[in-house]
Amino acid sequence: RKGIMLTLKTKGKINPLAIHEVEKFAAELLKQIPDSISCLIALHNNTNNDFSVRTYLPGGPRQNDASQVYADEWQDIDDIALTTDQDIYSKMASFGYNSILQDNVNVFRDGSLSVYYGEQNRRYINIETQHGKTVQYREMLKKLLSILDDEKKMVASQAATDMEQTTSLR
């Protein structure tokens, strides 16, 4: 509720009915997300120069919301990967994507899903591109899915190794 109030206040309009409806929507949305998922992926788009990696750089309006920011000079500033997870941040940045690691402690509590997931210490990533840039969208999403798939394989491989070691000790 606090995040909803703060967001509506920044927009200049606080309406009790709107607050109630947003709370209902948020509760229903959270019910739809299984607890078992390892990472929630959100897909957003923005308009040219309205919301970008610069928003999170020192001097930007959301500079306190990020603990780390990687801005690639060859990428469009509007195309970003924002995450609550250090590993995902590092990997997306290593592939040259504008990347933002949300500061889960100091982030502005705006009621967004990234803030909620950060508070829960859960993995969340938002792939966001300028409206209409579907090729970039797909490329970033494909790379993210590859990263997550590699992690899954590594966990499975480690589990198999652990099982072999346990069996050989008997």
Region locations from a protein language model:
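Structured catalytic-domain cores with a bias toward divalent-metal coordination
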Residues: 1-169
